[in-house]
Amino acid sequence: MSGGLDVLQMKEEDVLKFLAAGTHLGGTNLDFQMEQYIYKRKSDGIYIINLKRTWEKLLLAARAIVAIENPADVSVISSRNTGQRAVLKFAAATGATPIAGRFTPGTFTNQIQAAFREPRLLVVTDPRADHQPLTEASYVNIPTIALCNTDSPLRYVDIAIPCNNKGAHSVGLMWWMLAREVLRMRGTISREHPWEVMPDLYFYRDPEEIEKEEQAAAEKAVTKEEFQTEWTAPAPEFTAPPQPEVADWSEGVQVPSVPIQQFPTEDWSAQPATEDWSAAPTAQATEWVGTTTEWS
């Protein structure tokens, strides 16, 4: 499919991306029309997709998208959550028209409704989940491209790209690869330099996980500010006292003599004797003692 050109051949880094995202892992079921894209079957029943065929169909789909003069006439659709972010990113990069979320029935056939569209090409994420736009595209003769798993039905699909369309990383990587090839064929980016956009931007992220990450980051920032106010106060400048210069260490350092100040002292033996503590108790003490006779 690549015509034997080295420029269009799959690179090693592309294969590593496919393997890391699990693009080659299909399902346990196999549609008879997808048998041509299967490489082997694992012992646990999972079919392995031939990545060489995946790359060839990816280039064919990119050529079909580039052939449309107006990029807005290409509709990219994903009703599943795992492909909605990728569809929006693909549309922003290539200028296509995205439909993320529920597809309104009659969008391609009912001319009365406000959401009516007449695209020239349709790209869907899952033929099983996006069966409604595929069916309507068959009514109005719109060519279709689909990311197909091993068990995906190929009815009304003109160009099937075999891949794992269930995993979030695999779907995001396939849309990223498709957008990169479209931009390369248009001449927007060069094949000699890597694309500055990372595949991570096309991956689906759970909103609950995003909220947890934001809360954790906020708590970490608060604790960091508290520690900074407590521990990062400016420390007083410490200057070491000058050391005396000693030429000969055997002589030692001479301690300067300090005059001792004389304080007046008193003769404690000359003072008069204090009271006799053995004398009789005071009257107040006798009164307290007298009151205690009642308790006896």
Swiss-Prot record:
One of its GO terms (cellular component) is plasma membrane. It holds the Pfam family Ribosomal_S2. It is found in: Cell membrane; Cytoplasm; Nucleus. The modification N-acetylserine is found at S2. GO terms for molecular function: laminin binding; laminin receptor activity; structural constituent of ribosome. It comes from the Eukaryota. Its main location: membrane. One of its GO terms (biological process) is cytoplasmic translation. Acylated. Acylation may be a prerequisite for conversion of the monomeric 37 kDa laminin receptor precursor (37LRP) to the mature dimeric 67 kDa laminin receptor (67LR), and may provide a mechanism for membrane association. Residues 161-180, 205-229, 243-296 are annotated as: Laminin-binding. [DE]-W-[ST] repeats lie at residues 230-232, 248-250, 267-269, 276-278, 294-296. Required for the assembly and/or stability of the 40S ribosomal subunit. Required for the processing of the 20S rRNA-precursor to mature 18S rRNA in a late step of the maturation of 40S ribosomal subunits. Also functions as a cell surface receptor for laminin. Plays a role in cell adhesion to the basement membrane and in the consequent activation of signaling transduction pathways. May play a role in cell fate determination and tissue morphogenesis. Belongs to the universal ribosomal protein uS2 family. Monomer (37LRP) and homodimer (67LR). Component of the small ribosomal subunit. Mature ribosomes consist of a small (40S) and a large (60S) subunit. The 40S subunit contains about 33 different proteins and 1 molecule of RNA (18S). The 60S subunit contains about 49 different proteins and 3 molecules of RNA (28S, 5.8S and 5S). Interacts with RPS21. Interacts with several laminins including at least LAMB1. Interacts with MDK. This protein appears to have acquired a second function as a laminin receptor specifically in the vertebrate lineage. This is Small ribosomal subunit protein uS2. It comes from Gallus gallus (Chicken).
